[in-house]
Amino acid sequence: MSASRAVLPFALLCLTACATKPPYQARLADTQADCVERFESVRRHPLAVLDAKSRAKAPYVEFADVAQCLRTAQGSTALALYAIDEASRPAQVDISILPSPGGTFAASAELLDARFQRIERHSFAEFTRRGGEYSLSLFLDRAGPVYLMLVPDQDQVGKQESMIGSVNNQMMVPAGPVMFAVNHGAETQTIRAFMAGGRLKVTMRPEGSAAFSH
């Protein structure tokens, strides 16, 4: 057998394996290791105003990758803490959650002051289903909050949404000199679980600018 013939089956096998990507599965943040016991010690992510092009290019990230464990007297919880650029105000923060059959992050958003005291809280029920994502926009005035905190909304974690769709298939059937098209339609149902993890994106824009550009 020539070398080219020997390599061909291997190449086809590799191509098939590389093209087969496992389905997405949301990861949960670790609430056992790397825990801190004070808000001041929680890792912070800077949040500043971006132009429209930069906001559109901003990637979705796993909550587990941006969250850290905070241990309190009530127990341990995973949270993502964003430090808001005060010089950029007034502005608006846009939070986007990407739904997936592998897990949708049921997020609760809280705005905190400089002492990490809650100013306002928004449950996952306040997020709006807009196109292919859940979204929430928060207005920040000049004397507004210093931090944005995202945590799992325990009232929604464990629930699920059901999406109904349809699939249409067409098959061409020969009948002598002509062809007939046979159409077959079927209803589909997609179940998406609300979890304590999933993909999200947080951006900040100038006040009055368009919120979401896709």
Please identify what each model-predicted range represents.
Residues 1-8:
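Bacterial N-terminal signal peptides that target proteins for export
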Residues 19-21:
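Bacterial signal peptide processing site
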Residues 101-107:
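Short coil-to-beta strand junction motifs in C2/discoidin
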Residues 89-93, 139-161:
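Noncatalytic modules at the cell exterior or secretory-pathway interfaces
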Residues 15-17:
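C-terminal motif of bacterial Sec signal peptides marking the signal peptidase cleavage site
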